[in-house]
Each structure stands twice: as C-alpha cells, then as structure tokens.
Amino acid sequence: MPGGVYGHQNGAALGDGHPRFLARAERARIWDVDGNEYVDWMCAYGPMLLGYGHPAVEAAVAEQLASGDCLPLPGPRMVELAERLVSLTPRADFAVFGKNGADATSWAVDVARAHTGRPLIVRARGAYHAARPWSLPGLPGVPAHYREELLEFAWNDLDELRALFTGHGERIAVVITTPFDHVTGAGPAPGFFEGLRALCDTHGAVFAMDDVRAGFRFHLGGSGEHFGAAPDLICYSKAIANGHALAAGLGREPLRRAAERVYFTGSFFFASGAFAAALATLDVLEQTDAIARIQRTGRALTDGLAEQARGHGVPLLPVGQPAMPVIRFADDPERRRIRRWCSLVTEGGAYAHPAHNWFVSAAHTDEDVARTLEATERAFKTVATEG
C-alpha cells in the first residue's frame, strides 16, 4: 500500500503512543492488534454514534442480509428511509442515498450547479467537505481550473461573504458550510446563518449544509435545527447508520428538478443492509435520550479537561462543541506539544487525536470519562513539566 497505511488521517503520522492497526471494538472501546484496550474518542472518525456492535442495529442488519443486500434494484428499505428522513427533517422534501460523505456533498454541489446554471462554490476558509477535486483543489493531480471555481470567506464573517457575492454573485451556485467552524469548532455568531440565508436568497444561490460529521449528534432533524440554519440541501453520512456505509442528501422541493437531472449512482448504492442499519439507528435516537446523553458526556469530558489544563498551567484553547471537541494548545503552531500530549493520553488508555476533532457517542459512560481524565491528568502533568 502506498505509504504503508493510507487514508484521510494516516495513522503512521500520529505520535509514538498511537497504535497503527486495530483488531476489534465493542461499545466505546477499541483494542489494537497487540491487545491494548482504549476508550475511543474518535468513534471511527464519526460513524460510531450508539456504540460499536449495537445490538438493535446489528440485528436489523442481519435480518436484512438474510433476504439480500446489494441487488440490481433498490429494496423497500430505501423508500422507508427516505420517508423517515423527510418526516424528521423540517426543511426536506426528498432524499437520495450514497455511501460516503463525499458522495453527499458532491451531489449537493452538482444539484446546486444544475439548479442555478452557475459554476462557483463558496465555503468557509479551512473547511473540508470531500476528498474530491472541487473541495481540495490544491492537492497533486488536481487541474488548476478547480482552484478558480472555489471562493472562501472567514467563518462568521458576513462582510467578507457579502463582498464575494458583490463581486461574483451572478456566478455563485452554492454556499456550503458545516454547522460550526471546521477548524476551531466555534459555533455561528448571532445572525450569521440568517445573514447567509438572506445573501443566498438575494443572489439566487443555494445554501447547502454539510452535516456529514455533526449529523445526529445535536438534533434528530439535522444540526441546522440546533444551530438555527435554514439550508436548501442537507448532507449526511458518518453516524446515520452507526458505522454501516451510507450517505444521504436531502433537499427542498424547488431543487427536485435539478436533483432529477444530475447523474448520481454507485456500485453499492442499493445495498439494503445499510438502510436497515440507519432505520434502526433512528429508532434508537427517537426512543432514547441518546443525543442528550452525548451532549452531557461531552460537557463532562471537556469541563474536566479545562479544569486540568488550568491546574497545570497548560493553555488549552476553546474546544468548540463538547460533543465534537477540538483539542488544541495555544502557542503550539507545529502541534508538537499537542501531539506529545495525545501520545501520552493514548498510552494511558484513551485514544486521542492531535489534529482532528474528537467525537462523543451515546455509548461513552461515566467510567469512560473517568478513565480518560486519569490519563489526561498524567499527560498534562508531563507536558507541563517538559515545557
């Protein structure tokens, strides 16, 4: 394999304390190939929401697989899930399905371009929306014209966004954002999403919400409902099926014709096992306090980290959203100190990432938080001593 290990977050680039391969997982714990156990605060980079191997989800998948999975035509589970998502999401009238977050966000860009007849994409500076050329135009192998089709503004800066519309409004197809800042986790400033919505309406552009990472950790109807956003298109993946491969794109009625015109397909898009997993996941979310529990656990974790950092004089920056905290230190531009700290935390039994937001799940317990805070306390003490 190129580089030995590949992926959007190469494990080989992490600190010495991090494992390179994992053998199994259960609830909120993971075990590496050497048998070491960790509390997992990455949740498979987001897809794990209810716990690894959740019995209700896995039972639904097993029942579906007994009847068939990837077939030449879709099954009834696809229709059931589309109807369910539309019923749960106040600003959605239709749904389509893919496999990865990039499927959903790229579909949204295509729909917006088809609807408006325009080429330009606007996003917040530093945001990541897909491992696709339109989102990562500066990477090797990507033609230069992709860079010319992407405009950026600073998160929460309506003046800069307004200036982009003033200069390029007739060519802007879509503004795509996450529900909070991708880099810092900072939430929207008062009036930000209302202003963004008004600019899109004034200039005839589409507002797409990339809810791939955050979806279902804040609100059953989409993170926009929690943060006060009113998008035209919504993109889900990761947690929607508790670890089974699925993505969804939801849209408002005025964009239905454009959605009918774009070409959106894939070899495994009809696989019904993932639809069954998503339906079961939504059942659990509706029937329990899972989302509220995620928020409570995230606050307990991040409050504990903040108290420890203060006690040891380590300058912990604001973590953003407790359910998806961004752990960073001030005066650490090359991330050396945070990498050292995360390696120590991981060695202590809690899997911690130095360059990606963490994720909290409904499976994390008070015991998991306590075990983690024991590891982080020791790590803070060490990095404070090392300076």
Residue locations for each model-derived region?
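Conserved N-terminal phosphate-binding loop of PLP-dependent enzymes in the Aspartate aminotransferase
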Residues: 1-387
